[in-house]
Swiss-Prot record:
Keyword Signal: yes
Lineage of origin: Bacteria, Pseudomonadati, Pseudomonadota, Gammaproteobacteria, Enterobacterales
Function comment: Fimbriae (also called pili), polar filaments radiating from the surface of the bacterium to a length of 0.5-1.5 micrometers and numbering 100-300 per cell, enable bacteria to colonize the epithelium of specific host organs.
Localization per Swiss-Prot or TrEMBL: Fimbrium
Domain of life: Bacteria
Name assigned to this protein: CS6 fimbrial subunit A
Stretch forming the signal peptide: 1-18
Length: 154
């Protein structure tokens, strides 16, 4: 007797779910975009100096012209290793790499959530500095990584 009652309750609750209807209504959406923004392509210049293997040695620089309606700019490693640190990896031997950080023209470390104060049409250069402690021989080769340029639009 208990089995039959349980089955009837299950069937009764199944039937009530099958009859559920969804009421929908469309609402119009309208928005205005007031400013166009076109990010300029930055110029990336590798360093060919002898100090690349030293801590703080210049590895490469990123230069750009600040577009209109921008108050801050930041440049940071796409694959952030540890709080703003990137890794340049030798394309011929991935066991060879260089840890680096990017700083603005005043030497402040750049991160993705804050940038350097700028004015429109200003030329600004960010520097990628060797963050590996001590002096280290860096074998010649092509070292790759990716950086992101962030613009804070007014």
């Amino acid at each position: 007797m208990k089995k039959t009652i349980g089955l009837i309750l299950i069937l009764a609750s199944f039937g009530s779910h099958a009859r559920t209807e969804i009421a929908t209504k469309n609402f119009p959406v309208s928005t205005t975009i007031s400013k166009s923004f076109f990010a300029p392509e930055p110029q990336i210049q590798p360093s060919f100096g002898k100090n690349v293997g030293k801590e703080g040695g210049l590895l490469f620089s990123v230069s750009l012209t600040v577009p209109e309606n921008v108050s801050q700019v930041t440049v940071y490693p796409v694959y952030d290793e540890d709080y703003g640190l990137g890794r340049l990896v030798n394309t011929a031997d991935d066991s060879q790499s260089i840890i680096y950080q990017i700083v603005d023209d005043k030497g402040r470390k750049m991160l993705k959530d804050h940038g350097a104060e700028v004015t429109p049409n200003q030329q600004i250069t960010f520097r990628a500095l060797n963050y590996t402690s001590g002096d280290k021989e860096i074998p010649p080769g092509i070292y790759n990584d990716q950086v992101m340029v962030g613009y804070y639009v007014n």
